[in-house]
Amino acid sequence: MDLSQARAALKAARRVAVLTGAGISAESGIPTFRDAQTGHWARFRPEDLASPDAYRRDPDLVWEWYAGRYRDVLAAQPNRGHELLAELERRKGPGFFLATQNVDGLHARAGSGSAGGELVELHGNLLQARDELTGEVFPLAAPDELTLPPLSPNGQRMRPHIVWFGEYLPVDALDAAQRAFAGAEVALVIGTSSVVYPAAGLAAETLRRGGAVIEINPEATDLTPDATFSLRESASRGLELLLEDD
C-alpha cells in the first residue's frame, strides 16, 4: 500500500479505529511520561510515584506530583493532530472509535467523542480524581482552588483517576477498544511505540480480520513490519498527508 492507496482506503472506510500515544501530545508541549521528571522530581523514577504502593506510602507526595502535571496539562492546547482526528470523527460519525493512551484530555478538548463517534481514555484522565471508597469519578477543582489531597463531595479522599503501574486497564474500556479494532476496516496507530500491552495488541485485531493498519510515527516501531502502511512523520503531518485530498 502506498500513500494514495492509504488515503483512498481511509476515505472509503465506514468503520475506523484509532489508537494514539504520547507522540500526538508532544506537539502540544506535553512531555512524555518519563521526560516529565525534572527539577525536584528528577530524583524519582515514574514508577516511584505512579503506583498503588507509592500512593499508600506517601499520598501527599504523589498528589503533589500529579498536581504539577495537572497544571501543565491545563496550560497546553490541542494541536493540529487532535483537531484532524476530531474532524475525521465528524466525517465518519458512529463508525469512528478513538482509544488513547494519553491522560491529558486534549482529544476531548479538541472535540473528539462529541461528534457521533466514541472516545475511550484507556489510562484515565489527569483532570479527574475518584473517590477511594466508592470509585465515583469527579473533575478536579481549578488549580488555584485545588486542595491536596482532594476530597469527594461526601468527604472521602480521592486518588488520581489514572491507571498506575501494576493496575489493569478498565475492563469496559479495553473490551470496547478490542471490539472496535476487530471490526475496523482501517485502523490508525499514531504516536505510540507499540510496546505497551494490551494497547499494543489492538492493531493485530484489525489485521487478523483483514483490515488495514496505517501507522504514523517519526521512528520505526515494533508494529512497523506488520503495518499495511507506515508513515515516518509527526502525528499532525501524517494526518495532514492522509486527509489532504478529502
Curated annotation (Swiss-Prot):
Its EC number is 2.3.1.286. SUPFAM superfamilies: DHS-like NAD/FAD-binding domain. NAD(+) binds at residues 21-41, 101-104, 191-193, 217-219, 235. Substrate binds at residues 66, 69. One of its GO terms (molecular function) is NAD+ binding. The keyword Transferase applies. It is found in: Cytoplasm. One of its GO terms (cellular component) is cytoplasm. Gene3D superfamilies: SIR2/SIRT2 'Small Domain, TPP-binding domain. The keyword Cytoplasm applies. HAMAP family: Sirtuin_ClassIII (MF_01121). NAD-dependent lysine deacetylase and desuccinylase that specifically removes acetyl and succinyl groups on target proteins. Modulates the activities of several proteins which are inactive in their acylated form. Belongs to the sirtuin family. Class III subfamily. 2 residues (Tyr-66 and Arg-69) present in a large hydrophobic pocket are probably involved in substrate specificity. They are important for desuccinylation activity, but dispensable for deacetylation activity. This is NAD-dependent protein deacylase.
